[in-house]
């Protein structure tokens, strides 16, 4: 004779905490999603670690944190921002790699994968301009790495140009936009609106917007970085002007370190270069 299955029930003899614990375990096994606040908190923690690793120049941690965030990429509640910060981790891994003379192939792979993540972020949230800004920077760096391949350069330029123009139209007061546009102006010829002073003008505009509190959000999953990076680029630019302004370079670098004292690039690479140029 077949036995009837017995429905799951919690014995009344179990203590209340134990009953709740058993129920939570059962619900977890059934695939019930964790509360949004709990997931949000964990992602925010990982994002903070990513930004710290970026400033510290810790490329290994950036790779690991990119992978750690992958655990949340299927959560539709946070999919756009998870993709953004995964892309950010690889983007900054590549930028730090330039300072360490990492193999160009490795830099290219990181940047291409970052582009994919930023595209995912934009696909989920088309109005999230920061993903376009970051993707534009990655494409610009890929152009630099592809200088010996004119067809590849043309392909990347055709993609980066419209993307950054769209970002300018959508978010003209975003400080991070000016940080990304600056290098394109620095290296562009004068007859195309480029030049060293044009780039510095963009960085100053971005810094002014950052000081006004533009480009910030109450949600820590939305990017708010930018001011330290703009100060850093102003320091670098004044150091590398045709006629260097070393006092300005030093002042901007010190201001960046005041905001981020553990910034490896500014503290250990840029500041020594400025001091050497000053004859110290």
At which residue positions do the language-model features occur?
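N-terminal secretory signal peptides that target proteins for export/translocation
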Residues: 1-15
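Bacterial N-terminal signal peptides
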Residues: 19-29
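Boundary at the C-terminal end of the N-terminal hydrophobic targeting segment
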Residues: 33-37
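Short coil/turn linker motifs that delimit alpha-helical repeat modules in TPR/alpha-solenoid proteins
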Residues: 38, 75, 82, 124, ...
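Short coil/linker segments at helix-helix boundaries
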Residues: 45-66, 89-127, 134-166, 180-232
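Residue-level recognition of tetratricopeptide repeat
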Residues: 79, 128, 174, 213, ...
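TPR/TPR-like alpha-solenoid helical repeat scaffolds
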Residues: 217-238, 264-280
């Amino acid at each position: 004779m077949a036995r009837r299955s017995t429905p799951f029930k919690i014995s009344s003899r179990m203590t209340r905490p134990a009953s709740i614990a058993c129920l939570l375990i059962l619900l977890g096994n059934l695939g019930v999603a964790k509360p949004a606040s709990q997931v949000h908190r964990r992602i925010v923690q990982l994002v903070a670690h990513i930004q710290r690793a970026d400033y510290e120049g810790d490329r290994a941690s950036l790779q690991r944190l990119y992978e750690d965030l992958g655990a949340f990429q299927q959560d539709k509640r946070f999919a756009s921002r998870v993709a953004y910060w995964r892309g950010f981790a690889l983007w900054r891994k590549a930028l730090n790699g330039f300072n360490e003379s990492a193999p160009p192939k490795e830099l290219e792979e990181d940047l291409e994968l970052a582009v994919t993540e930023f595209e995912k972020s934009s696909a989920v949230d088309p109005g999230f301009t920061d993903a376009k800004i970051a993707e534009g920077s990655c494409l610009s760096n890929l152009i630099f790495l592809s200088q010996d391949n004119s067809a590849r350069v043309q392909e990347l330029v055709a993609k980066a140009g419209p993307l950054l123009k769209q970002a300018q139209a959508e978010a003209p007061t975003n400080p991070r936009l000016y940080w990304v546009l600056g290098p394109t102006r620095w290296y562009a010829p004068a007859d195309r609106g480029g030049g060293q002073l044009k780039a510095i003008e963009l960085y100053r505009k971005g810094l002014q917007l950052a000081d006004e509190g533009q480009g910030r959000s109450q949600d820590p999953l939305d990017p708010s970085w930018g001011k330290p990076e703009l100060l850093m680029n102003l320091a670098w630019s004044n150091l590398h002007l045709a006629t260097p302004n070393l006092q300005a370079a030093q002042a901007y670098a010190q201001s960046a370190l005041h905001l981020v004292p553990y910034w490896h690039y500014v503290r250990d690479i840029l500041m020594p270069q400025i001091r050497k140029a000053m004859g110290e």
